[in-house]
Amino acid sequence: MAKKKSPGTLAENRKARHDYNIEDTIEAGIVLQGTEIKSIRRGSANLKDSYAQVKNGEMYLNNMHIAPYEEGNRFNHDPLRSRKLLLHKREIIKLGDQTREIGYSIVPLKLYLKHGHCKVLLGVARGKKKYDKRQALKEKAVKRDVARDMKARY
Protein backbone atom coordinates (compact mmCIF):
# COMPACT_ATOMS: atom_id res chain seq x y z
CA MET A 1 0.00 0.00 0.00
CA ALA A 2 1.41 3.41 -0.96
CA LYS A 3 2.28 5.84 1.81
CA LYS A 4 0.08 8.90 2.12
CA LYS A 5 1.74 12.28 1.92
CA SER A 6 1.61 14.45 5.03
CA PRO A 7 -0.75 17.43 4.61
CA GLY A 8 1.99 19.98 3.89
CA THR A 9 4.06 17.79 1.55
CA LEU A 10 3.73 18.88 -2.08
CA ALA A 11 6.38 16.69 -3.73
CA GLU A 12 8.80 14.02 -2.57
CA ASN A 13 11.95 12.56 -4.10
CA ARG A 14 11.66 8.92 -3.01
CA LYS A 15 14.20 7.80 -5.62
CA ALA A 16 16.89 9.87 -3.87
CA ARG A 17 16.65 7.74 -0.73
CA HIS A 18 17.19 4.65 -2.90
CA ASP A 19 20.09 6.06 -4.95
CA TYR A 20 21.94 7.91 -2.16
CA ASN A 21 22.98 7.57 1.46
CA ILE A 22 21.62 10.74 3.05
CA GLU A 23 24.13 11.95 5.62
CA ASP A 24 22.74 15.36 6.59
CA THR A 25 19.56 17.34 5.93
CA ILE A 26 18.83 21.05 5.92
CA GLU A 27 15.71 23.11 5.28
CA ALA A 28 15.84 25.94 2.75
CA GLY A 29 13.37 28.46 1.41
CA ILE A 30 12.93 28.76 -2.34
CA VAL A 31 12.36 31.81 -4.54
CA LEU A 32 9.35 31.19 -6.80
CA GLN A 33 7.26 33.17 -9.25
CA GLY A 34 3.49 33.47 -8.82
CA THR A 35 2.54 30.88 -11.41
CA GLU A 36 5.13 28.45 -9.99
CA ILE A 37 3.66 28.40 -6.49
CA LYS A 38 0.15 28.01 -7.89
CA SER A 39 1.28 25.06 -9.98
CA ILE A 40 3.15 23.52 -7.01
CA ARG A 41 0.05 23.79 -4.81
CA ARG A 42 -1.80 21.78 -7.46
CA GLY A 43 0.85 19.04 -7.14
CA SER A 44 2.61 19.67 -10.46
CA ALA A 45 6.20 19.62 -9.18
CA ASN A 46 8.76 16.90 -9.85
CA LEU A 47 12.02 16.64 -7.87
CA LYS A 48 13.38 13.67 -9.82
CA ASP A 49 16.87 14.32 -11.31
CA SER A 50 17.13 17.69 -9.57
CA TYR A 51 20.14 18.84 -7.56
CA ALA A 52 21.40 21.89 -5.70
CA GLN A 53 24.61 23.71 -6.54
CA VAL A 54 26.61 26.62 -5.13
CA LYS A 55 27.27 29.41 -7.66
CA ASN A 56 28.88 32.75 -6.76
CA GLY A 57 28.19 32.29 -3.04
CA GLU A 58 24.52 31.48 -3.62
CA MET A 59 22.68 28.16 -3.71
CA TYR A 60 20.53 27.22 -6.72
CA LEU A 61 18.19 24.31 -7.34
CA ASN A 62 18.58 22.96 -10.89
CA ASN A 63 16.43 20.60 -12.99
CA MET A 64 13.36 20.80 -10.75
CA HIS A 65 10.38 20.55 -13.10
CA ILE A 66 7.31 22.64 -12.30
CA ALA A 67 4.57 22.22 -14.90
CA PRO A 68 3.23 25.45 -16.44
CA TYR A 69 0.16 26.85 -14.71
CA GLU A 70 -2.83 26.28 -16.97
CA GLU A 71 -4.42 29.68 -16.31
CA GLY A 72 -1.05 31.45 -16.46
CA ASN A 73 -1.34 32.68 -20.09
CA ARG A 74 1.68 34.61 -21.39
CA PHE A 75 3.11 35.25 -17.91
CA ASN A 76 3.85 31.57 -17.35
CA HIS A 77 7.25 30.43 -16.06
CA ASP A 78 9.99 28.30 -17.62
CA PRO A 79 9.43 24.75 -16.23
CA LEU A 80 13.13 23.87 -15.73
CA ARG A 81 14.69 27.21 -14.72
CA SER A 82 17.24 27.41 -11.90
CA ARG A 83 15.61 28.53 -8.66
CA LYS A 84 17.47 30.34 -5.91
CA LEU A 85 17.45 28.76 -2.46
CA LEU A 86 17.30 30.90 0.67
CA LEU A 87 19.96 29.90 3.18
CA HIS A 88 22.24 31.68 5.63
CA LYS A 89 25.77 32.36 4.36
CA ARG A 90 27.34 29.96 6.87
CA GLU A 91 24.98 27.19 5.73
CA ILE A 92 25.93 27.78 2.09
CA ILE A 93 29.63 27.66 2.97
CA LYS A 94 29.14 24.45 5.00
CA LEU A 95 27.22 22.75 2.17
CA GLY A 96 29.76 23.94 -0.40
CA ASP A 97 32.61 22.47 1.63
CA GLN A 98 30.78 19.15 2.00
CA THR A 99 30.12 18.85 -1.74
CA ARG A 100 33.73 19.56 -2.66
CA GLU A 101 34.54 16.10 -1.33
CA ILE A 102 34.43 13.50 -4.07
CA GLY A 103 31.17 11.56 -4.29
CA TYR A 104 28.98 14.02 -2.39
CA SER A 105 26.10 16.02 -3.82
CA ILE A 106 23.10 17.98 -2.59
CA VAL A 107 19.72 16.55 -3.57
CA PRO A 108 16.23 17.82 -2.70
CA LEU A 109 14.27 15.27 -0.70
CA LYS A 110 10.94 16.97 -0.12
CA LEU A 111 9.01 20.08 -1.15
CA TYR A 112 6.47 21.26 1.42
CA LEU A 113 4.58 24.22 2.87
CA LYS A 114 5.44 25.63 6.26
CA HIS A 115 3.36 28.54 7.56
CA GLY A 116 2.34 29.36 3.99
CA HIS A 117 5.89 29.43 2.62
CA CYS A 118 7.32 26.83 0.27
CA LYS A 119 10.36 25.00 1.70
CA VAL A 120 12.76 22.40 0.34
CA LEU A 121 14.40 19.72 2.45
CA LEU A 122 17.92 19.25 1.08
CA GLY A 123 20.08 16.23 1.78
CA VAL A 124 23.85 15.99 1.62
CA ALA A 125 24.16 12.64 -0.09
CA ARG A 126 26.74 10.14 -1.19
CA GLY A 127 25.87 7.93 -4.16
CA LYS A 128 25.28 4.23 -3.61
CA LYS A 129 26.88 1.56 -5.72
CA LYS A 130 24.70 -1.04 -7.41
CA TYR A 131 25.59 -3.75 -4.88
CA ASP A 132 24.65 -1.40 -2.01
CA LYS A 133 21.20 -0.90 -3.55
CA ARG A 134 20.72 -4.66 -3.92
CA GLN A 135 21.79 -5.23 -0.32
CA ALA A 136 19.33 -2.58 0.92
CA LEU A 137 16.49 -4.23 -1.04
CA LYS A 138 17.34 -7.65 0.45
CA GLU A 139 17.37 -6.23 3.99
CA LYS A 140 14.04 -4.52 3.38
CA ALA A 141 12.49 -7.78 2.11
CA VAL A 142 13.79 -9.74 5.12
CA LYS A 143 12.45 -7.10 7.50
CA ARG A 144 9.05 -7.21 5.79
CA ASP A 145 8.93 -11.03 6.00
CA VAL A 146 9.81 -10.99 9.71
CA ALA A 147 7.11 -8.40 10.40
CA ARG A 148 4.57 -10.47 8.44
CA ASP A 149 5.49 -13.62 10.40
CA MET A 150 5.26 -11.79 13.73
CA LYS A 151 1.85 -10.40 12.79
CA ALA A 152 0.58 -13.86 11.80
CA ARG A 153 1.91 -15.37 15.02
CA TYR A 154 0.10 -12.94 17.35
Curated annotation (Swiss-Prot):
<comment type="similarity">
    <text>Belongs to the SmpB family.</text>
</comment>
<dbReference type="InterPro" id="IPR023620">
    <property type="entry name" value="SmpB"/>
</dbReference>
<dbReference type="GO" id="GO:0003723">
    <property type="term" value="F:RNA binding"/>
</dbReference>
<dbReference type="GO" id="GO:0070929">
    <property type="term" value="P:trans-translation"/>
</dbReference>
<dbReference type="InterPro" id="IPR020081">
    <property type="entry name" value="SsrA-bd_prot_CS"/>
</dbReference>
<keyword id="KW-0694">RNA-binding</keyword>
<dbReference type="GO" id="GO:0005829">
    <property type="term" value="C:cytosol"/>
</dbReference>
<keyword id="KW-0963">Cytoplasm</keyword>
<comment type="function">
    <text>Required for rescue of stalled ribosomes mediated by trans-translation. Binds to transfer-messenger RNA (tmRNA), required for stable association of tmRNA with ribosomes. tmRNA and SmpB together mimic tRNA shape, replacing the anticodon stem-loop with SmpB. tmRNA is encoded by the ssrA gene; the 2 termini fold to resemble tRNA(Ala) and it encodes a 'tag peptide', a short internal open reading frame. During trans-translation Ala-aminoacylated tmRNA acts like a tRNA, entering the A-site of stalled ribosomes, displacing the stalled mRNA.</text>
</comment>
<protein>
    <recommendedName>
        <fullName>SsrA-binding protein</fullName>
    </recommendedName>
</protein>
<dbReference type="Pfam" id="PF01668">
    <property type="entry name" value="SmpB"/>
</dbReference>
<dbReference type="InterPro" id="IPR000037">
    <property type="entry name" value="SsrA-bd_prot"/>
</dbReference>
